């Protein structure tokens, strides 16, 4: 009772509470807040003294038996004082702080949920990789995005292959190796009856004869009969660039080569009397088919001189080609 009186008198007189705390080393933890509030006489200072005394009481080291009780009471008191402030003080400060704490926590939860929704693909591969490591290789694509992406990629590749196969279908082409003859077979065949292609032989018989005659340039095998037979001459001269239907100077219609006004060949060429024509005068070379062999032919303009029976020869054109080109020229010009 004496301690309570001294404590009540100290609270009524307004003395600082720190002076009494040093005198109460063991009983400080047992003093209650209710006693201080009863003995305090000033109503304006009642709540402030109670709060400060409660804080100082919590700061004191409690006894061993009352450690849990004093701790629980201090925690309850601090929460009660924090949630229930004095009406005389600014009542909006702690309330705003509590509202700010609640709003910050909710905003953090909202940001976390928004980030999870915004980036699902970035977080799930790591989860799937760890899950695959835990579950092993027996379940490689179970419950993950990487497995689904791999399956979708493989399906995409297969679909592209199907599109290309449907667009570019494979058509089997049989290999036709029978019944194909080369150009040399037509132009250089010795036995016309043994080839087996009678229609082709009939078309290429004259060309074959002319080719053989050109092949043997060492002898005078190009006779007027061979040169004038069928249409070989008429087709072969335009191929070489010879115009065989030139008009005469007098305006009379020109006579083609091989008509009665034609003289005998002179140096493997022809000349006409009383007309002007481009004629072939020389065909040299060894068309044996070997590499490096060339055939050269020269074209001259021969103009007859009136009354003398002589001609003025003017060179016009000279061309050199290989035997292979001559074969193609003869065959493609439909010479028969």
From Swiss-Prot:
In the UniProt record, which is one GO cellular component term?
Answer: AP-1 adaptor complex
Which Pfam family, any one, appears in the UniProt record? Clathrin_bdg
Show the GO MF annotations: clathrin binding
- Disulfide cysteine pairs (residue numbers): none
Q: What residue spans carry the region label Disordered? A: 29-93, 116-147
Q: What's any GO biological process attached to this entry?
A: intracellular transport
Q: Which InterPro entries match?
A: Aftin-like (IPR046359), Clathrin-bd (IPR029205)
UniProt feature, compositional bias: Polar residues: 70-82, 125-141
Q: What is this protein called?
A: Uncharacterized protein CLBA1
Native source organism of the sequence: Bos taurus (Bovine)
